[in-house]
């Protein structure tokens, strides 16, 4: 009986490890201050929570200086291991399930784009040096204004504090090979995802 119990325990442990290896969480982060963001942009833009307290004017100032706001990011986003910042890549194997968690106070999108570009908010595009919207993010209306593309498996919008299933690696939404992803609201939020075949080795 003791060995049976041990065997069951080992099987459960192996099952847990297998589960952990095939579920990857992509975290969206920001540090918006609810009072100042909601006063300028509109009610509900930033939801209160333990995500930070960057004032809207400071947020804009950082974008004017650096063309990014560092607290607004995907995790993983940046890799400084070689002494300079570069986009970190997320390695997955075909069949992996992704989960998208919004740990910030604003809504963010997780959108696959052919080429990194601007989003559907012209003001933020201009501040960050992204004058040309990624077509997967934005539609241009006859008057020149931008509206978001419809939500899809490769263009997911996640509200503040929410967690949603993301695309499955190897699916049409997240195909094998290299793909580029960005937030269509905050277009400096970017990441590269590489999906490998199940038995392919990678660095």
What is the role of each PLM region?
Residues 5-15:
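Bacterial N-terminal signal peptides
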Residues 19-203:
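Extracytoplasmic copper-binding redox domains, predominantly the cupredoxin/blue-copper superfamily
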């Amino acid at each position: 009986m003791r060995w049976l119990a041990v065997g069951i325990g080992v099987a459960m442990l192996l099952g847990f490890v297998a589960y952990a290896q095939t579920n990857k969480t992509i975290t969206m982060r920001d540090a918006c201050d609810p009072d100042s963001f909601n006063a300028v942009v509109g009610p509900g833009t930033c939801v209160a929570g333990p995500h930070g307290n960057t004032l809207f004017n400071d947020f804009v100032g950082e974008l004017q200086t650096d063309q990014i706001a560092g607290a607004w990011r995907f995790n993983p986003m940046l890799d400084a291991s070689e002494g300079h910042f570069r986009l970190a890549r997320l390695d997955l194997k075909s069949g992996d399930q992704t989960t998208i968690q919004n740990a910030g106070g604003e809504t963010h999108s997780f959108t696959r784009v052919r080429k990194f570009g601007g989003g559907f908010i012209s003001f933020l595009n201009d501040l960050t040096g992204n004058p040309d919207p990624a077509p997967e993010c934005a539609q241009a209306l006859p008057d020149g204004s931008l509206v978001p593309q419809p939500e899809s498996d490769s263009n997911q919008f996640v509200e503040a504090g929410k967690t949603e299933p993301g695309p499955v690696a190897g699916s049409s939404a997240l195909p094998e090979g290299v793909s580029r992803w960005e937030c269509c609201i905050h277009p400096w939020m970017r990441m590269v995802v590489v999906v490998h075949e199940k038995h392919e080795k990678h660095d």
